[in-house]
UniProtKB/Swiss-Prot annotation:
Gene name per UniProt: leuS
Entry keyword annotation includes Aminoacyl-tRNA synthetase: yes
Key word Protein biosynthesis present: yes
Species for this entry: Exiguobacterium sibiricum (strain DSM 17290 / CCUG 55495 / CIP 109462 / JCM 13490 / 255-15)
Record-stated family: Belongs to the class-I aminoacyl-tRNA synthetase family.
Recorded GO CC terms: cytosol
Cellular localisation: Cytoplasm
Enzyme class: ligase
Identification of the protein by name: Leucine--tRNA ligase
Amino acid sequence: MPYNHREIEPKWQARWEQDNAFVTTEDPEKEGFYALDMFPYPSGAGLHVGHPEGYTATDILARMKRMQGYNVLHPMGWDAFGLPAEQYALDTGNDPREFTAQNIETFKRQLKDLGFSYDWDREINTTDPKYYKWTQWIFTKLYEQGLAFVDEVAVNWCPALGTVLANEEVIDGLSERGNHPVVRVPMRQWVLKITEYADRLLEDLDELDWPESVKEMQRNWIGKSEGAEIDFTIDGHKKQVTVFTTRPDTVFGATYLVLAPEHPFVTDITTEDHEEAVKAYIASVQTKSDLERTDLAKEKTGVFTGAFAVNPISGERLPIWIADYVLATYGTGAIMAVPAHDERDHEFAKQFDLPIIEVVKGGNVDEVAYTGEGEHVNSQMLDGLSKQEAIETIIAELETNQVGRKKITFRLRDWLFSRQRYWGEPIPVVHMEDGTMKTLDKSELPLELPMIPEIKPSGTGESPLALAEDWLDYTDPVTGLKGRRETNTMPQWGGSCWYYLRFIDPHNEEAIADPEKLKYWLPVDIYIGGAEHAVLHLLYARFWHKVLYDIGVVPTKEPFQKLYNQGMILGENNEKMSKSRGNVINPDEIVKSHGADTLRLYEMFMGPLDASVSWSENGLDGARRFLDRVWRLFERTADIQDVTTVDADFERVYHQTVKKVTEDFTNIQFNTGISQLMVFVNEANKQPVLPRHFLRGFIQLLTPVAPHLGEELWEQLGFEDTLTYAAWPTFDETKLVSDTMEFVIQVNGKVRSKLVISMEATKEEIEALAFADEKTQEWIGDKTVRKVIVVPKKLINIVAN
C-alpha cells in the first residue's frame, strides 16, 4: 500500500489536538527550553513557503528537546495591529477586527496543517484588549521612568490621505499608496528615550550568541562616536552654534558652517538679501525623506544665509550655509565643514566654490578629500602632531577657553512612538483641563479601542480616534477633573516588543507574567526569524526588556540568548518571490500534492538554514521519494525482528546516524542531519533482517522533521503512546568505528586486489594475508619479489619483476 499523506496527516493532527499533545510541561525537576518563532503579521495572503522554513526549524528543536527530557515552551501568536488592516478598513468601510480575525483563522489552519507542535493554549493576539492591557501598562512604566515624553517632531504629512506616513511609506516625495505629495511638517508626537540605553544596548551585544552580521548592524545603528563639541559665535548676534565633530583636530581647516534647514536659528540669522532664497530652499526640502537627503550619491544643494560664524580657535569668519544633507535630528543639527578632509564637505565646497584648506598632510585636497592619517599642517599649535595627539591637544585648548568640550554621541535617535492611525493600541494618557498630563492607573486598563462606524483620517493630523467624541471625554475618578484622551496610537512595534514574555504566562490577570515563571523560562533559548528584523524589532525589544529589568519585572538583562536568521526562499529563477512576478508558492497546494512532511523535509534539506536558496520542484519531488522509500522499508514487516546479533556494518551506521543527527539538529545543521538519515535508509535496504530497535531509533530521529509519518510508523511498530515524549535515542561511542578495515593490495604500484583485515593486524600478518590472496598470486606469478611496502591502515605494495 503506497504512503497516503492525505489520510495519515489529518489523522495525526486530529489525534494531537484531541490529546493536547503539545501542552507545555512545567516540571520543576526538568530543565526548560524556550523555542520561539518571530510571530507573523496575519496578512490577507496567508502563509507563503518562506514562513514554514523558520517554523520547521524551531519545531525540530522543540520536538527533539521534548524527547530529550526538557520542559519545552513552543508558542505561537499574532502581531495583528498594523497598516494593511487599517488600509483595508479605509478602502472597504469594514472593521479591521473582522479582517484580522479571518486572516488569523486562515494562518492558524495552515500552521496546524503543517504539523507544528505549538502549545495553542498559549496563543496570543496583540489586538486582544487582555493582551494590550499590558502593552499599555508598560507604556505607563516608561512614562514614570521619564522615558516617554511629548515632542515636536518633523513628520511626513500627506494632505491628500489626511495622515502621517512612516519613512518607508514615502518614495521620492510621494506616498507609496496613491502617489500623493508628502511634506515634512512639525507635529506633536510621543517619543521614547531609547538613547538613554544606548551604551548598554551596545555593550551587552557582546554577551549574545547572535550572528555577527546582526550584532554589527546594531552597533552601526547605535553608532557610538567619540569627539568634541565646539561653540561658534555668530557675528552680530548673541547666539552661538554648537557643532559635534569626531575630528576636532581639523578645526583650522573649517571654511564654512552648515545648518540643517530646520535649525531653530535659521530664520533669525538669515540676512534680508538672502531671505527669499532661504525660504524657497526650505520649502523644497520639505518633500524629501531623511534617507533621500543623506544619499551620498545625490548632487549637493544648499543656500547661503548671509550670516557668518567665528572660529573660536583661529578667529576666522566662516560663512553659514543651510543644506539638506545636515539633519536637525542628528547631532546638533549643525556641522563645521572641513572640505579638505571630508568627502561630502568637499563636494559641497566644489559645487559652491568655497575655500579648501589642507590641515592633514597626505593627499591632493584640491582634487579629492584626504580622509587618511598624517601630520598636521596650517594648524598653529597642532602643526607636526599626529591625529591622536592633535585631538587631545585641541580638546584641552577648547576646554581651557570654555569654547568646547569632549563629547560622546550616538547615531541612535529617540524612538518616535506615536502613529496617527486607528488600528493600534490607544496610548493610555489623558490631557487634563488644567494643562497637566496623566497616565491611566493599572485599574483603568485596558483602555479599549472604541468601535467607530467609519474609520477615516481625521484630516487634522490626529488619528481617526479624534472623531470618537464620546470616547475622548474623561473624568478623573479621584479629583473629578475633566480631560481629553490621547488620540495617537502606538506603532506596530509596541505589541511585538514584549510578546515573548506573555507566552510564559498568557492568562495572568495580575501581571505580565508570574516572576517565578519568568525566572524559569528566560532568556529565550532560540529565536528564529528573518534578517529583516535585525535592527528595529530586535533593538526595540532589547530596550523594553532592559527597562523592565531595571524596574524589577524581568530577571535577565537580555531577552534572546541565541538568535538565528533563516535565509530566503527564492523563486525557481533565483528571483525574490512576489505577487507581481507571479512566482509565489502557496504551502496549501504543496500539502495537498506532496504532504506537509515532504514540505518540511524539503525546506530543511534545501541547503544550510541561513542560506538563500531557489525553490525547485525536482527537489520537492526528491524529498517525497525519500519518504516513500522510508514507508516501503517499514512495509517489510516480516524482516523487522527483535534480534540479539546484528550486522556489524549496519550497527555502525545506526550509531553514527544517532550521533550525527543529534549533533547536527542541535547545531541547526538540518540538511546534513537529513543526509545521514538517507545514508541509514540506503544501508537498511541492503539488510535481509531489520533489527526492530534500530528502526525504532530511526523513527525518533526522523520524526522532528516528518512528524506525521513518524507517528504512523511508530504505531505500526506496535507502540500505543505518541512518541512526543519517547526518550531520544543514544549512541555507543565504541560502536562508531569498525574493528576491521578494507586494505588495498598493489602489485608494482597498481591496485590488484582488496582485503578486509583486522584493525589490529601486524605488518607480518598483513603480508601473509596478501601473499595468500589468489588475485595477488596471479599478478605476481613467477616474478621475483624485490620489495614489500606496508602503509599501516591503508595499503600494501608488492614490487616484483
